[in-house]
């Protein structure tokens, strides 16, 4: 039995996917049952990395999603539109969907999955998070007997590359970003990466799977890495930390134990933490569950090979079902998505965590005492408060707190910022507790 598929997009990931499908030797035998019937592209004249018959290429994307011979549509276009509309149109024509589009799933997942369940088709998205790291399927299947407590990940290779180079070279953000763009690791407009938006899309998806409820993308608190300086990285190193952009879904971090904390932000993590050694363009995801404890997933988070590997694994899953089932089998609950309720999400002000903060203060007697009093007025307990040195004639003071409610900490900073001796608060970074 041959299963015909159609691809929407033939960029880096699309080309990598076709390369795997055209070279089945030594891979899953199910690959030999797959025929690429159509590939949607913007231009028929553009040079390609892969060899495909001219009749396979088309600029008519709607013809692919409505073709009665095509059983699986692989969406690799990226972006919100027309990707969302084409996915929904394909579902309405009873096509199974494989996608690497985290932005569409994070924002329109409920709409897409409702349509898929209504029409009896699958929407699989292993490639949407973590590139080649198998994390979606383990959360849905292998870890199903666990009560997930937290998911903590380095989910964006661009920002991890930038922070890794800033750490190893002592370089500033702008300098490393420019180098990353020249090497092709960062886009000309890097906002989705460096502002944390890409990682926020991904943690919204993982949280939905891990905690068994829908997640609104706007409920993910999001901060990027533009404000992280070489100075902070150096001080973090002296304190026994490294700085990483973490995406966190935590069922235990807020005052309300029934609500999740969903957040993306630069974070100080101890050097002996499992994620501290995830460097360069690599991704890592640490899942904590009961009774398993901790399990970590690690690998290349982007690129043609890793992402195409995840795409093809989803295609193989669906092909296996099609070739071994009755004509209209019931959806496998381990592959489909059926939850209807939304996860309750706690506001970031209720987060309980530690903080690192750097102050530039006038070099006058009593300034450290005034800082300590300002924190004490709001119940903020300090782990350390030390004067590191001088910058532009100001005393540079670094504070690390014990666990504190974020709202209380921010109130303390507001009071402290009004002190005459406090000239600037350049950095406020959370510390992973």
UniProtKB/Swiss-Prot annotation:
Enzyme class: oxidoreductase
Chemical reaction(s) catalysed: L-homoserine + NADP(+) = L-aspartate 4-semialdehyde + NADPH + H(+); L-homoserine + NAD(+) = L-aspartate 4-semialdehyde + NADH + H(+)
Keywords for the protein's UniProt record, in alphabetical order: Amino-acid biosynthesis, Metal-binding, Methionine biosynthesis, NAD, NADP, Oxidoreductase, Sodium, Threonine biosynthesis
Residues involved in NADPH binding: 12-13, 102, 303
One Pfam family it belongs to: NAD_binding_3
Residues the record marks as active site: 202 (proton donor)
EC number: 1.1.1.3
Binding residue positions for NAD(+): 13, 303
Pathway note: Amino-acid biosynthesis; L-methionine biosynthesis via de novo pathway; L-homoserine from L-aspartate: step 3/3; Amino-acid biosynthesis; L-threonine biosynthesis; L-threonine from L-aspartate: step 3/5
Domain of life: Bacteria
The keyword Oxidoreductase appears for this protein: yes
Protein known as: Homoserine dehydrogenase
Organism for this UniProt entry: Synechocystis sp. (strain ATCC 27184 / PCC 6803 / Kazusa)
């Amino acid at each position: 039995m041959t299963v015909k598929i159609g691809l929407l997009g033939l960029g880096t990931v699309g080309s990598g996917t076709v390369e795997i499908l055209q070279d089945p030797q030594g891979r899953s035998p199910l690959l030999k049952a797959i025929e690429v019937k159509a590939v949607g592209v913007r231009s028929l004249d553009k040079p390609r990395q892969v060899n495909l018959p001219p009749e396979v290429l088309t600029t008519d994307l709607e013809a692919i999603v409505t073709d009665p011979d095509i059983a699986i549509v692989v969406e690799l276009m990226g972006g919100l539109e027309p990707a969302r509309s084409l996915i929904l149109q394909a579902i309405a024509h009873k096509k199974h969907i494989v996608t690497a589009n985290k932005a569409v799933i994070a924002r329109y997942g409920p709409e897409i999955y409702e349509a898929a369940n209504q029409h009896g088709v699958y929407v699989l998205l292993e490639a949407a998070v973590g590139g080649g790291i198998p994390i979606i399927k383990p959360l849905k299947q292998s870890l199903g007997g666990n009560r997930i407590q937290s998911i903590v990940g380095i989910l964006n290779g661009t920002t991890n590359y930038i922070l890794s180079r800033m750490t190893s070279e002592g370089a500033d953000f702008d300098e490393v970003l420019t180098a990353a763009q020249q090497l092709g690791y960062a886009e000309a407009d890097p906002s989705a990466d460096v502002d944390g938006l890409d990682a926020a899309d991904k943690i919204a998806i993982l949280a939905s799977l891990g905690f068994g409820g829908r997640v609104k993308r706007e409920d993910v608190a999001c901060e990027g890495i533009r404000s992280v300086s070489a100075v902070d990285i150096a001080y973090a190193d002296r304190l026994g930390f490294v700085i990483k952009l973490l995406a966190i879904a935590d069922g235990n971090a807020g005052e309300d134990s029934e609500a999740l904390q969903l957040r993306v932000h630069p974070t100080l993590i101890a050097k002996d933490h499992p994620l501290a050694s995830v460097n360069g363009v690599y991704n890592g995801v640490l899942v904590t569950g009961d009774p398993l404890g901790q399990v970590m997933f690690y690998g290349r988070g982007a690129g043609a090979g890793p992402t195409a590997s995840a795409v093809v694994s989803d295609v193989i899953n669906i092909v296996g079902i099609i070739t071994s089932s009755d004509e209209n089998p019931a959806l496998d609950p381990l592959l489909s998505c059926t939850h209807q309720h939304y996860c309750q999400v706690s506001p970031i002000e209720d987060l309980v965590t530690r903080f690192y903060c750097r102050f530039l203060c006038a070099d006058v007697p009593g300034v450290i005492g005034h800082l300590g009093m300002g924190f004490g007025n709001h119940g903020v307990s300090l782990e350390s408060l030390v004067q590191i040195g001088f910058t532009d004639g100001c005393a540079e003071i670094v504070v690390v707190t014990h666990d504190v409610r974020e709202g209380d900490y921010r109130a303390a900073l507001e009071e402290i910022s009004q002190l005459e001796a406090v000239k600037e608060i350049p950095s406020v970074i959370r510390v992973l507790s």
